[in-house]
Amino acid sequence: MSSGGLLLLLGLLTLWEVLTPVSSKDRPKFYELPADIGPCEDFTGAFHYSPREHEYIEFIYGGCEGNANNFNTLEECET
């Protein structure tokens, strides 16, 4: 492959890296925490990010404590 072709390939790979969506490696560390129902019993629906599933999953939250991987709505956890 010519040096021009290599430069083009390098440029395209760099552009792809910059434009790809945020991956799980770039997520804050709290996304690695498991869903935590907490000790209270005011059960309500919440969402958490599952690194194993690579998606947001609904779970039942007790209403207090828990951890930072806990969102009220799907929209909230995607932002």
Swiss-Prot record:
So which residues are the signal peptide here? 1-24
Its annotated compartments are: Secreted
SMART domains reported for this sequence: KU
Every copy of the BPTI/Kunitz inhibitor domain together lies at 31-79
- Entry keyword annotation includes Zinc: no
Q: Does the keyword rRNA-binding apply?
A: no
Top-level taxon in the UniProt lineage: Eukaryota
- Which cysteine residues pair off into disulfide bonds? C40-C64
Alphabetically sorted, this entry's keywords are: Disulfide bond, Protease inhibitor, Secreted, Serine protease inhibitor, Signal
What is the stated purpose of this protein? Answer: Serine protease inhibitor.
Name used for this protein in its record: Scutellin-5
The organism of origin for this protein? Oxyuranus scutellatus scutellatus (Australian taipan)
List the taxonomic lineage: Eukaryota, Metazoa, Chordata, Craniata, Vertebrata
